[in-house]
């Protein structure tokens, strides 16, 4: 887990910022073991965020405090520990690796929990989820079941 402790999420990147530029801006805080700018699989264009792993977790904390909210290549960046941001602010539409598609109904404990407990569950990327049957009368057994039949076989 030591490598995870030194791993930072960097969001709000300029689409032209690459690994080298990111490393150049953060290397003054200490030795870096890995720099990744996440790219779209098909277009290879930056998705506007990345990760930096410091060999020493204390260096990562120093970098996070100093660089969060700073400007990099003309964009204000957000820097946080990697584990926090992946679950917290970005967990909504993805629901923690798609587990929101289970039929449990409660969903407490999946993802961050911030989006799952909203009444009706609409507006946060869960439109296709089957967890909300009956809450809004849309895609459930009361409308004939034709939406659910394809998924239940």
From Swiss-Prot:
The modification Omega-N-methylarginine is found at residues 47, 103, 118, 128. The keyword Nucleus applies. One of its GO terms (biological process) is response to cold. Residues 81-153 are annotated as: Disordered. Residues 6-84 form the RRM domain. Residues 89-112 have a biased composition (Gly residues). It is found in: Nucleus; Cytoplasm; Cell projection, Dendrite. The modification Asymmetric dimethylarginine is found at residue 103. InterPro entries: Nucleotide-bd_a/b_plait_sf, RBD_domain_sf, RBM, RBM3/CIRBP_RRM, RRM_dom. This is RNA-binding protein 3. One of its GO terms (molecular function) is RNA binding. The keyword Cytoplasm applies. CDD domains: RRM_CIRBP_RBM3. The modification Phosphotyrosine is found at residue 151. The modification Dimethylated arginine is found at residue 103. Keywords: Cell projection, Cytoplasm, Methylation, Nucleus, Phosphoprotein, RNA-binding, Stress response.
